[in-house]
Amino acid sequence: MSIIPLLHLARELDHDYRTDWGHLLEDDFGFGVHAHDLFHPRRLLLPNTLGLGRRRYSPYERSHGHHNQMSRRASGGPNALLPAVGKDGFQVCMDVSQFKPNELTVKVVDNTVVVEGKHEEREDGHGMIQRHFVRKYTLPKGFDPNEVVSTVSSDGVLTLKAPPPPSKEQAKSERIVQIQQTGPAHLSVKAPAPEAGDGKAENGSGEKMETSK
């Protein structure tokens, strides 16, 4: 009897064991989602032929080297996923598929956007679990905190956006004043009325002085 089928079986069992535990520990809710990931949806993984259970579902397939990126993001390394800032303004996306919309809050404190997600203890495939995260994003200089908007998609991606600040040309207050055509100027322009009781003589006016005899 060949031992090759047994080797394949052992490899599959080891892979499923590592995968299930990896997904259990890889509860990466609240982390950023790269724009590239949004265009590569993950297929729902059905139970394999061995009947060893269903892997944890996440709506997006992570890009190559995701586990290394996760560790760098958690440590705040140089390759951490940062908000995108460009000509279209400020934008950041994050995976919140583990939370319902009413379990999320977004608020602005000064020029910082604070995102919080929390749900009470509930049962999942591994037991009881309670999730809570808080993420903060500082708006770049010039961005108006009052312009921040947030959306959450049906597949669990929260997006924060803020329009770009106005350019220097747009910041200047400019208004075109319409020129109206009128009749003779003396009919439309009023002469300024002199102020009463100011006690001052106007230019060219005479002043009579009385002397005592």
From Swiss-Prot:
<feature type="modified residue" description="Phosphoserine">
    <location>
        <position position="58"/>
    </location>
</feature>
<feature type="compositionally biased region" description="Basic and acidic residues">
    <location>
        <begin position="197"/>
        <end position="213"/>
    </location>
</feature>
<dbReference type="InterPro" id="IPR008978">
    <property type="entry name" value="HSP20-like_chaperone"/>
</dbReference>
<dbReference type="GO" id="GO:0034663">
    <property type="term" value="C:endoplasmic reticulum chaperone complex"/>
</dbReference>
<dbReference type="GO" id="GO:0008340">
    <property type="term" value="P:determination of adult lifespan"/>
</dbReference>
<feature type="modified residue" description="Phosphoserine">
    <location>
        <position position="75"/>
    </location>
</feature>
<comment type="similarity">
    <text>Belongs to the small heat shock protein (HSP20) family.</text>
</comment>
<dbReference type="GO" id="GO:0050832">
    <property type="term" value="P:defense response to fungus"/>
</dbReference>
<feature type="domain" description="sHSP">
    <location>
        <begin position="71"/>
        <end position="182"/>
    </location>
</feature>
<keyword id="KW-0346">Stress response</keyword>
<keyword id="KW-0597">Phosphoprotein</keyword>
<feature type="region of interest" description="Disordered">
    <location>
        <begin position="157"/>
        <end position="213"/>
    </location>
</feature>
<protein>
    <recommendedName>
        <fullName>Heat shock protein 27</fullName>
    </recommendedName>
</protein>
<dbReference type="GO" id="GO:0005737">
    <property type="term" value="C:cytoplasm"/>
</dbReference>
<dbReference type="InterPro" id="IPR001436">
    <property type="entry name" value="Alpha-crystallin/sHSP_animal"/>
</dbReference>
<dbReference type="Pfam" id="PF00011">
    <property type="entry name" value="HSP20"/>
</dbReference>
<dbReference type="GO" id="GO:0061077">
    <property type="term" value="P:chaperone-mediated protein folding"/>
</dbReference>
<dbReference type="GO" id="GO:0051082">
    <property type="term" value="F:unfolded protein binding"/>
</dbReference>
<dbReference type="InterPro" id="IPR002068">
    <property type="entry name" value="A-crystallin/Hsp20_dom"/>
</dbReference>
<dbReference type="GO" id="GO:0005634">
    <property type="term" value="C:nucleus"/>
</dbReference>
<dbReference type="GO" id="GO:0042595">
    <property type="term" value="P:behavioral response to starvation"/>
</dbReference>
<dbReference type="GO" id="GO:0042742">
    <property type="term" value="P:defense response to bacterium"/>
</dbReference>
<dbReference type="GO" id="GO:0042026">
    <property type="term" value="P:protein refolding"/>
</dbReference>
<dbReference type="GO" id="GO:0009408">
    <property type="term" value="P:response to heat"/>
</dbReference>
